[in-house]
Every structure is written in structure tokens, then in C-alpha cells.
């Protein structure tokens, strides 16, 4: 035997506890099994064991966790799955599963489907905060979409009437659980959105129920109806859970129908107080405006225009006459200047015509002179032109040869001649 110091029971237990608390595999785990040894203490804590064919584990479901449980009552023999963390009870030296959530078998798949739908709708922007409609401060007409026979509608009407007796209430009855519930809820919301009813705010929901009872408010059609509503919607489903999709799509959600009515409907005394304050502000604003306008009128009445209006009018009239005379003179000067310019243009035109006439006469004279000196005119006076066979003009006898044939150009035509002699 080794000479080591023996451990106390407490020390061993503490070591085991540290090992358990330090293990990630024993934290936030799901465990499934059959309930046995079920009991509920006066403190509200629930104790039971989960067992299968080979083992058993003690479980504690404390009251601060089990008060949110809305499923079917727990009892021995029921198959469930629980979520929690393994802890060690030092005094007894036994380990225990500290339960924070309980689901009936099969609920896990449903929750997974709800989570997938939640993610899909979130991507579409169905839950975006900026799309939320503002709940009116002073609604005239309240619309209610819920079961006509449940406690929820009684609570909503009772609270609404007690807070503001004059509120108009319009009820669109619908089925709130079961296979037909989603279509019924959607129809009720669409009816309350009809413009004829002039509904200012809608409370839609029901009292508490089990996980299965509340499934209609996780239906995609219902969630979209909430999001597409023209009228602001307050979701009011009792025993709120963290997977109720209609709560996320609503413009506001409350944990109970009673809380929804209290949120939607103001107290009559608060409305009267608001109106009184508003009246006071309006009166104060009017008094300030009247006083300001009175001072302005007093200031304006001391000005010259109000003291001697006719004198000012005469001055303005005289000024208009002066401007008219100046305009008349300016127009007359413009016309005279234009007239002088026109006369200048007319004289210039006459001078240009005379110059053109003289230029034409000179051109005709010189044209006549040029024509008189042309070969044709000279030949008309009895002269002729002599050319050799190459067309060269003969100017002297030396340029020809005896017996050479020549061409004579006369005024009336041409003829051929032959040179004779030397």
C-alpha cells in the first residue's frame, strides 16, 4: 500500500463534482426516457426519474423553469425528452439532471420545422422591426380576433370597457386551435381589415394552452396575415413561448389578452388629461399669436402709410406720371433716331443706284469700243485675214511661197487663193 494521504469523502465528492461540472458533454444536453417516481413539492419543484431498459437518472424540474411548461401534465410512464445539465448533489453524493425544458416525444421535430419556417420568414423580412406599424395612442374602434366563447374575449372586453367606456368594439369570431384554426384566424384578420369597419387596432390571440393548442399561431398563413395586415395587430396569446411566430410578426405582442387590452386602450382619465393639456397648449399658442399680431399691428399703425395714406398715394401717382413722361420721351427719341437712320438708308440707296447707272454707261461705252476694234468689225470695213494651210496668219509676202494655196477670211465668209508671181 502506497504511503499517500487518504482523501475524505467530501474531498472525493468535490473532485467528482469538479469533473462533472467541467465536462462539456454533461452540459445543456437532451435526454429521453420514461418518467417514474413523479412528485411535485409544495414549493412548486417537480422531482422524477428518467429510465430506460438499462439505467435510471434522477431529475429536478425547479419551479422557475416548470412554470413556463405548457405541455400536457407529466405523470409516471410518460415518454418525454428533457433538456438540462448534470450536477452533483454533494450532501447525498449522487448526480442529478437539472431540467430546464421538457418536451413530449415528437415535439422536437415540430420545433425544428418551426425554426426552419422562422428562418425562412426572417429572410423575407417578415419580422423586420422597421416594418412594424405604430399602435395608435387613441383608437376609436378596437377589433378582436379570437374565440367567441373563451375567457380571452371576456377579459379583453372587460378591460377595454373599464379603461374607456366609449370605445367601439368589433368582434371577428374565429377558431383558435385545431386543423381549421389557421384559415379561421386569417379570415377574421382580413375581415377586420375591411375599410368599412374603420378598425384602428386589432387584438388577435387566445388564452393559454398546451404546445399543440397554440400551434395555429405558428402556422405560416397566420404569420403572413399578421405581417400583411393594414391595421396594426397586437398578439395576445397566453403563456407566451419562445417559438410563437405570430408574436414576431405582430406589431406588438403581450403575454396575455388582458395585457393586450391594457396596452391598446388608454384610460379615460388619461385621455381627458391629454385633451386638457392639449387645450391649454392651444390656448397658450393663440394668446401668444394674438399678442404678437397686436404688437405688430400697433407698430404698423405708427408708420407713415397708415397716418397719411392719401399723401402717399399722391406721391406714388406723381411718380407714375413722371415715369410715364420719361417713357414717352424715350420712345419719341427712339422713333426719331430710327427715322433719321431710315432716311440715311434711303439716301444711300439712291446714291448706290446712281453709281451703278454711271458704271453701266461706262461699261457699255468701252464694250462698244472693244467691239469696234475686233477682227470681225475690221473685216466689215473691207479688211481680210490671210492664212496658210496650217492656219498661220500671213502678215507679209515673204511668209508665202509661189503657187502656195492660201485661205482668205472675209466678212462674209472664206475663200481659197493661189499666190502667183514671185
Swiss-Prot record:
Keywords: Cytoplasm, Exonuclease, Hydrolase, Nuclease. It is an enzyme of class 3 (hydrolase). GO terms for biological process: DNA catabolic process. Disulfide bonds: none annotated. One of its GO terms (cellular component) is exodeoxyribonuclease VII complex. Coiled coil: none annotated. GO terms for molecular function: exodeoxyribonuclease VII activity; nucleic acid binding. The keyword Nuclease applies. Gene3D superfamilies: 2.40.50.1010. Its EC number is 3.1.11.6. It is found in: Cytoplasm. The keyword Ubl conjugation does not apply. Pfam families: Exonuc_VII_L, tRNA_anti_2. It catalyses: Exonucleolytic cleavage in either 5'- to 3'- or 3'- to 5'-direction to yield nucleoside 5'-phosphates. Belongs to the XseA family. NCBIfam families: xseA. Heterooligomer composed of large and small subunits. Bidirectionally degrades single-stranded DNA into large acid-insoluble oligonucleotides, which are then degraded further into small acid-soluble oligonucleotides. This is Exodeoxyribonuclease 7 large subunit. It comes from Leptospira interrogans serogroup Icterohaemorrhagiae serovar Lai (strain 56601). The gene is xseA.
